[in-house]
Swiss-Prot record:
Nucleotide-binding among keywords: yes
Gene name per UniProt: Dhx33
UniProt-annotated stretches for the region Required for nucleolar location: 1-71
Localisation per UniProt entry: Nucleus, Nucleolus; Nucleus, Nucleoplasm; Cytoplasm; Nucleus
Protein name: ATP-dependent RNA helicase DHX33
Originating organism: Mus musculus (Mouse)
Post-translational modification: Ubiquitinated, leading to its degradation by the proteasome. Deubiquitinated by USP36.
Region (Disordered): 1-20, 29-50
Residues that coordinate or bind ATP: G88, E89, T90, G91, S92, G93, K94, T95
Chief location category: nucleus
Residue window of motif Critical for rDNA-binding: 536-550
Ranges for region HA2: 462-553
Gene Ontology molecular-function annotations: ATP binding; ATP hydrolysis activity; DNA-binding transcription factor binding; double-stranded RNA binding; mRNA binding; rDNA binding; ribosomal large subunit binding; RNA helicase activity
Catalysed conversion reaction: ATP + H2O = ADP + phosphate + H(+)
Amino acid sequence: MPEEASLPPAKRFRPGSCPPGRRVVMLLTAGGGGGAGGGRRQTPPLAQPSASPYREALELQRRSLPIFRARGQLLAQLRNLDNAVLIGETGSGKTTQIPQYLYEGGISRQGIIAVTQPRRVAAISLATRVSDEKRTELGKLVGYTVRFEDVTSEDTRIKFLTDGMLLREAISDSLLRKYSCVILDEAHERTIHTDVLFGVVKTAQKRRKELGKLPLKVIVMSATMDVDLFSQYFNRAPVLYLEGRQHPIQIFYTKQPQQDYLHAALVSVFQIHQEAPASQDILVFLTGQEEIEAMSKTCRDIARHLPDGCPSMLVLPLYASLPYSQQLRVFQGAPKGYRKVIISTNIAETSITITGIKYVVDTGMVKAKKYNPDSGLEVLAVQRVSKTQAWQRTGRAGREDSGICYRLYTEDEFEKFEKMTVPEIQRCNLASVILQLLAMKVPNVLTFDFMSKPSPDHIEAAIAQLDLLGALEHKDDQLTLTPIGRKMAAFPLEPRFAKTILLSSKFHCTEEILTIVSLLSVDSVLYNPPARRDEVQSVRKKFISSEGDHITLLNIYRTFKNIGGNKDWCKENFVNSKNMLLVAEVRAQLREICLKMSMPIMSSRGDMESVRRCMAHSLFMNTAELQTDGTYATTDTHQPVAIHPSSVLFHCKPACVVYTSLLYTNKCYMRDLCVVDAEWLYEAAPDYFRRKLRTARN
């Protein structure tokens, strides 16, 4: 087990309070300011609880949130500011309450209040919660818009949406005219969409002011962030600190570096489990679904053989692609005599609040994207968290009472962590970003006002990729979109998948390609519990295609549709029914976009070669060939890669494949593979492969 930190941790860490050495612009405490908050206007009255016990409970919960007593102060300040940065820890109530306070204060009279979220699940669940609190049907006063789903109406005044969806709206209206206020929530996550949105919203606010239009209020919210950077970027915006209910947290570090963080986490969990009262729950941070499912199984197996007197253990995994009904279990109390052990990805860092957590076990690892513009490879890699992420994880232990965090790394190791997480825009493929900016008619993408500028190499690599996909042309020393590029931008997809759909009519397989792209656009439709691996493999045999994962997924979807989306069938075949229904919705919307473009929609009628040819013509930059020693290397850069164990091709050795993504753990794995002929690739991009071949020879 880790040893205790040398300094009293409670003194070192109080999320929500002002970090040492930083200038405080304003301090809003949850212990005061319940009246008018010093503002000249009267604070608008809150709705009174209704007779319904559920409504009454909601209203009581709302009034008990840390933010409630600062309501008057907050509203008085926000009314008079064009820009504000608000810091308040997870669970303070800022995300659900600030939009309501602004609405109750009349901010929405001249336009909608938008609240952006990095995650689809958060946008939907928050909109549902706020509509309940406002006693209105979801989609009326309060609604949400996420990719492929719009639950709003003409009456909507508070709108939760993913940052990517607000970006898509900016393509058709760069001034965001329908909004009076944009709240950029979870800003610290710095996703690729969030960073682009910062620049788009800032530009819209400036242009509206220059044109004498309705002012746009911008509020940036987070549990933690580099406030100086955000304040400077948004025109020296005042920073409002909102204190919450954080309790003291003891922090323990390991004495020695851990070679196997998974084993260290397992040992820590069972040591806590055998010593702590059953009512105190444990939250463990791991990096991804496979690790989480494997550890969940191991914990359950070990828990069955513990001595008498030990509490029972309820092990609950938590990750984005887990079926929604199973995600909800982490918020429910454990049965009497049971301890909840939640094993989660970084989704539990800030996006959600889980009650009952006394102990946090932090492995200090996370799975994040990395991009190499020279090789053109974008991989998911397991790496160290930043100090900011480590503090966020620690803070999960102090929500309701004092807590304990076990950091499975030494204090010296922690001191070497990066202070902040590198923004995604500086470590990702930027092809989607450049396509969107050009669709918004940004005059020069190289000089766009990014908060953290990507390297010129990354931008140039993205431009080169879009060029290869036929999306760009150079006119009067300016980059513009070709007709194909404009069509690609109309799809809410990565450029390569948009191009796949556009090419499908040439290969007479649009129906099949629409299904495959839709399947790749949602979280995994397959559920693979490690404890039932043999059973999973047995029932899936009937769907497997030797032509690859894409065709296998296509077979599963077709059967799902043929049996009418039967839930029992989904359960028997380990298919996530909710995600499969979402695939059907996504497909319908993509098909509608095709029809608007007057694209002929044809089926290959069982001819899978035409489907694979189409994939080869759009994914030619993601190809690998079998080497003489039986290994694989990417066709263009000769990077060694391997077929992922989850692929239906894992035990096969096709000569040439295209893949959808790369995952780096102990080696670089290809995921979602399709068998292709090398000839098709040279047919798709002869100049590209000639150039690569010449470089390789030199």
